[in-house]
Regions:
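A beta-strand-loop signature enriched in Asp, Gly, Thr, and Trp
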Residues: 41-50, 72-97
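Bacterial peptidoglycan biogenesis and beta-lactam-recognition machinery
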Residues: 15-24, 31-39, 58-81
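Catalytic-site signature segments of enzymes, centered on catalytic residues
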Residues: 1-53
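Active-site Gly/Thr loop motif
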Residues: 38-40, 86-139, 146
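Short, gly/Ser/Thr-rich active-site loops of penicillin-recognizing serine hydrolases
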Residues: 149-170
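Non-transmembrane alpha-helical segments in soluble domains
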Residues: 11-14, 23, 27, 31, ...
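Active-site-proximal alpha-helical segments within enzyme catalytic domains
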Residues: 9-13, 53-74, 127-144
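Carbohydrate-binding/catalytic loop surfaces
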Residues: 44-57, 105-107, 112-115
Length: 170
């Protein structure tokens, strides 16, 4: 079942092993290559990056991240993430838990698996990066939500469902 402990512990392990926090570790390997900077993140009281969230990106940067996944880990001719990682991280690994959305059918490694050939990463205040592989599309959204809510996500999912129904893909 989904929870935030796994991604948090991954960040802790990376920092202990490399002596660099998660952002410092990922910057030359991922963020610099995608031209995403400067990055801000939330830290826990013990000094570790909160690996399950708190990463701040604008909508264009979020879209680049989604495009990297849509392109199976390849960016400007370089394989930044392995295709195997893309495949494993975006497929259903565990049940959704209490995430109540009719378009979500499971959780992968940091991604929600959606019905059809689609998946998304989302933030607690209305940030979404949705990859629609079957439509060769990425949708990135930064909304001004001030409360932890999935109102924006529900609206997006409703419109995607309507679009798929109209295109005969549901």
């Amino acid at each position: 079942q989904y929870n935030n402990a796994g991604p948090y512990l991954l960040g802790v392990l990376i920092q202990r092993k490399t002596e660099k926090n998660l952002i410092e570790y990922l910057t030359p390997r991922l963020f610099d290559k995608l031209e995403i900077k400067p990055l801000e993140a939330e830290f826990c009281p013990k000094g570790y990056v909160f690996g399950a969230g708190g990463l701040q990106m604008n909508v264009r940067e979020l879209g680049k991240f989604g495009q990297l996944y849509l392109q199976r880990g390849k960016w400007k001719g370089e394989q930044i993430l392995s295709e195997k990682w893309i495949e494993e991280s975006t497929k259903k690994q565990v049940e959704c838990g209490d995430y109540n959305n009719s378009q979500v059918d499971g959780y992968g490694y940091l991604f929600w698996h959606l019905k059809g050939d689609a998946y998304m990463a989302n933030g607690k205040y209305g940030q979404y990066c949705i990859v629609l592989s079957d439509q060769n599309s990425v949708i990135s959204v930064n909304s001004p939500e001030t409360e932890q809510s999935d109102r924006v996500g529900r609206y997006i999912m409703k419109k995607l469902k309507e679009g798929r129904r109209n295109n005969g893909k549901e």
